[in-house]
């Protein structure tokens, strides 16, 4: 609600921000001022999904500032084009068997073929709305009905990857280059979701040869779209999502590995501004 458009120019209510390394009191905000976004050098778009109408409207407003020369990270065109779950499907060689549909018969046929399937919405985050349906198909009708809103909304069905027990690994790319360590988000007991927001624990690990191959597959398009900060989600040998809205796990990797991912990102931004 701080963004608005007037006479063809994007404005925002802004406050200076000071960040502290104290989980009990980790930031301070200064006095609010109302200014045109064109006065800024950079805007970091870090609004979390869902990518709903309000998210899309905010991106469109940032596009007005972008056209006045402000660097928006990530670029507005890429944010509008790259649904985080569908974007990965542009690299089928990197993905587990997947179907996207709203039709009950298509989703049931996929489950019948693969037996063990994850169903999830296309616009969620943090493991919300994710269901695991086993070979017995128990509750499949209720899950499909709930997620598709009785056939009115497209959802994703993906073959279940048992490697999730070893973690859903977040791999961060800064200006197309990978951070050398990922964060394996390991599900808690009885869970199939590794997301930290769903109770998973994060363990940093070095990237594997397969990870580097996956990165090489997506790098050209990521660079072509001007994406500066990207998070790949990898389970076993497969990419499950390509996060472009608000990639996380920076602090967890930095704390375990002594890296400075924020510094890498700011260096990349400064290179774009030079």
Predicted regions located by residue number:
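ATP-binding N-terminal substructure of ATP-dependent carboxylate-amine bond-forming enzymes
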Residues: 1-71, 78
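Flexible, glycine/proline-enriched loop segments at strand-loop-helix junctions
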Residues: 46-53, 92-101, 130-131
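Short amphipathic alpha-helical segments and helix-helix/interface helices
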Residues: 59-66, 85-88, 107-108, 144-145, ...
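Hydrophobic alpha-helical segments and helix pairs
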Residues: 69-119
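Short glycine-enriched loops at secondary-structure junctions
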Residues: 76-80, 185-187, 235-238
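Phosphate-binding site of ATP-dependent enzymes
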Residues: 105, 112-116, 123-214, 222
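ATP-dependent carboxylate activation and anion-phosphoryl transfer catalytic cores
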Residues: 189-190, 206-274
């Amino acid at each position: 609600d701080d963004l608005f458009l007037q006479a063809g120019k994007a404005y925002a209510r802004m406050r200076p921000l000071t960040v502290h390394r104290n989980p009990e009191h980790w930031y301070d905000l200064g006095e609010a001022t109302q200014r045109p976004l064109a006065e800024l050098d950079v805007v970091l778009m870090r609004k979390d999904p869902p990518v709903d109408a309000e998210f899309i409207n905010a991106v469109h407003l940032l596009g007005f500032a972008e056209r006045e020369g402000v660097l928006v990270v990530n670029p507005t065109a890429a944010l509008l084009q790259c649904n985080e779950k569908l974007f990965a499907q542009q690299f089928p060689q990197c993905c587990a068997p997947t179907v996207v549909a709203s039709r009950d018969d298509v989703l049931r046929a996929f489950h019948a073929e693969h037996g063990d399937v994850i169903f999830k919405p296309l616009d969620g985050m943090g493991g919300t709305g994710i269901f695991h349906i086993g070979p017995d198909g128990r509750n499949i009708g209720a899950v499909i009905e709930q997620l598709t809103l009785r056939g009115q909304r497209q959802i994703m069905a993906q073959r279940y990857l048992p490697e999730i027990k070893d973690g859903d690994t977040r791999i961060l790319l800064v200006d197309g280059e990978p951070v050398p360590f990922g964060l394996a988000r390991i599900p808690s007991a009885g869970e199939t979701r590794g997301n930290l927001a769903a109770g998973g624990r994060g363990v940093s690990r070095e990237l594997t040869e397969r990870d580097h191959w996956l990165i090489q597959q997506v790098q050209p398009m990521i660079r072509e779209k001007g994406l500066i900060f990207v998070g790949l989600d990898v389970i076993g040998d497969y990419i499950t999502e390509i996060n472009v809205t608000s990639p996380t796990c920076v602090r967890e990797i930095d704390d375990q590995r002594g890296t400075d991912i924020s510094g890498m990102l700011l260096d990349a931004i400064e290179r774009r501004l030079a």
